[in-house]
């Protein structure tokens, strides 16, 4: 018997279900009862109960796409902070070069990279790689850190939430599965985007978040609420600003657990020789032309009317 509802906020030791249900992430079984291990939100999938913690550290998984900052240059590899208890390692073989001097000429300390987790061994040694579309070095921008389990809420269903933030601030935004968010735009818009991202992180477990985010964005960017009015003669429509660097959003899972596939993170650019990330322009889709109406039936009707009149 299920004793809680989907997305209920629970505390450690709280009984979630009995008998026919199975324990999942963030839970433990005691006798025939399934209990929560964390303060978090309930997620039920096929009789399996999970608790998604409100606060957690990023645990690397093979295939994850993450944002990391170089903190150390070692012999034949770079060490990176990936917002995790475990340090990420980028071998020189994943880029090029053999000695420390060559490594520094490619990436230096405090450089920020978009990488893929290649492997995680039994002692949590995290090997990173740059082979893949869109992976490489970021130029400028700011970093914002959020709880990794709240990444799907920031992204939203089919990228709806993150797209709204990008459209209203005209910023390029890339979200790593490790809870690191890269933002680049005009300085004032970067600060607005940062404030909104942190708000989503704080209030991810609450209802009505999308409407509150939209209202905050409109207020901070100075956009008035849309009001339906009749246009008078001589009134010019304001031009809609277009962002040349607007990036195409990928589809994201609504579930809290992020799939490790590359489609679960926004692409930044095609892989270039200097491994630097650049924004891509989004090609506007053309509208599908409407099908032409068949005039055959109308023609037949006219012939019948003429025959009737002759009679």
UniProtKB/Swiss-Prot annotation:
Belongs to the RRP4 family. HAMAP family: Exosome_Rrp4. GO terms for molecular function: poly(A) binding. Coiled coil: none annotated. Component of the archaeal exosome complex. Forms a trimer of Rrp4 and/or Csl4 subunits. The trimer associates with a hexameric ring-like arrangement composed of 3 Rrp41-Rrp42 heterodimers. Its main location: cytoplasm. This is Exosome complex component Rrp4. PROSITE patterns: KH_TYPE_1, S1. Residues 222-311 are annotated as: Disordered. Residues 241-300 have a biased composition (Acidic residues). The lineage of its organism: Archaea, Methanobacteriati, Methanobacteriota, Methanomada group, Methanobacteria. Gene3D superfamilies: 2.40.50.100, K Homology domain, type 1, Nucleic acid-binding proteins. Residues 139-197 form the KH domain. InterPro entries: Exosome_RNA_bind1/RRP40/RRP4 (IPR026699), KH_dom (IPR004087), KH_dom_type_1 (IPR004088), KH_dom_type_1_sf (IPR036612), NA-bd_OB-fold (IPR012340), Rrp4 (IPR023474), RRP4_N (IPR054371), RRP4_S1 (IPR048565). GO terms for cellular component: cytoplasm; exosome (RNase complex). Residues 301-311 have a biased composition (Basic and acidic residues). It comes from Methanothermobacter thermautotrophicus (strain ATCC 29096 / DSM 1053 / JCM 10044 / NBRC 100330 / Delta H). One of its GO terms (biological process) is U4 snRNA 3'-end processing.
């Amino acid at each position: 018997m299920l004793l809680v509802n989907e997305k209920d906020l629970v505390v450690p030791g709280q009984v979630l279900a009995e008998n026919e249900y199975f324990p999942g992430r963030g839970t433990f079984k005691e006798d025939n009862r399934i209990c929560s291990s964390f303060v978090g939100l309930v997620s039920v999938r096929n009789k399996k109960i999970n608790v998604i913690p409100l606060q957690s550290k990023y645990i690397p998984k093979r295939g994850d796409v993450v944002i990391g900052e170089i903190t150390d240059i070692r012999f034949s590899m770079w060490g990176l902070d990936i917002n995790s208890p475990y340090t990420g390692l980028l071998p020189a073989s994943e880029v090029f070069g053999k000695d420390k001097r060559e490594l520094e000429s490619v990436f230096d300390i405090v450089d920020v990279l978009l990488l893929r987790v290649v492997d995680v061994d039994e002692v949590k040694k995290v090997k990173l790689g740059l082979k893949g579309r869109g992976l490489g070095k970021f130029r400028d921008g700011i970093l914002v850190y959020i709880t990794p389990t709240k990444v799907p809420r920031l992204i939203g269903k089919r990228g709806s939430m993150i797209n709204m933030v990008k459209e209203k601030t005209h910023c390029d935004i890339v979200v790593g599965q490790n809870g690191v968010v890269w933002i680049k735009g005009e300085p004032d818009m970067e600060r607005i985007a940062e404030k909104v991202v942190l708000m989503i992180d704080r209030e991810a477990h609450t209802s009505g978040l999308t409407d509150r985010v939209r209202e905050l964005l409109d207020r901070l960017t100075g956009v008035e609420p849309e009001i339906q009015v009749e246009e008078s003669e001589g009134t010019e429509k304001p031009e809609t600003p277009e962002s040349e660097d607007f990036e195409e959003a990928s589809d994201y899972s609504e579930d809290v657990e992020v799939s490790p596939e590359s489609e679960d993170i926004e692409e930044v650019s095609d892989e270039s020789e200097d491994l630097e990330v650049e924004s891509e322009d989004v090609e506007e889709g053309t509208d599908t032309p409407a099908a032409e109406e068949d005039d055959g039936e109308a023609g037949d009707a006219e012939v019948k009317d003429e025959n009737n009149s002759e009679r």
